[in-house]
Curated annotation (Swiss-Prot):
GO cellular component term of the entry, any: host cell membrane
Protein name stated in the entry: Movement protein p22
Biological process, per Gene Ontology: transport of virus in host, cell to cell
Key words, A-Z: Host membrane, Host-virus interaction, Membrane, Phosphoprotein, RNA-binding, Transport, Viral movement protein
Subcellular localization: Host membrane
Modification after translation, per record: Phosphorylated.
GO molecular function: RNA binding
Function: Cell-to-cell movement. Displays RNA-binding activity.
Amino acid sequence: MDTEYEQVNKPWNELYKETTLGNKLTVNVGMEDQEVPLLPSNFLTKVRVGLSGGYITMRRIRIKIIPLVSRKAGVSGKLYLRDISDTTGRKLHCTESLDLGQEIRLTMQHLDFSVSTRSDVPIVFGFEELVSPFLEGRELFSISVRWQFGLSKNCYSLPQSKWKVMYQEDALKVLKPSKKKASKTDSSV
């Protein structure tokens, strides 16, 4: 699956206006494409899609994410797409680590999975594996950054995001061994 993303720097108020217009998700049901909004999960939004076919596939997912933390906080994380119809929260897609201090524009052309129109389809987009070199980064990152798309009447609980607060000294300790290993492999080639 091809995933394109870019990170740009704009004033927060401009980004907020853009984002409130709504992140879009194009869903293919049978032979028809239908565009539905993705809203923050704290709105508990449920989207109704005309179920004319047997399976639903996700296509052309476009998400804009405004920075919710200062760039100086150094917070990064991976954007996950999960099916939370059961407790395992099956991973459908995961991006590389992204800087949450900048705007993120994410485009996913096609997701390699489909779900039956007869079943519940609670799909959640959210940041996980959050990393910050400062303890303050954890305090700053207090706003929910999850979006929910669902075809279910039931309520589902979202899996908790795990924080990795890494101090500068620990980060250096982690980096040093990997550099030594890389130099050894380079010299042997």
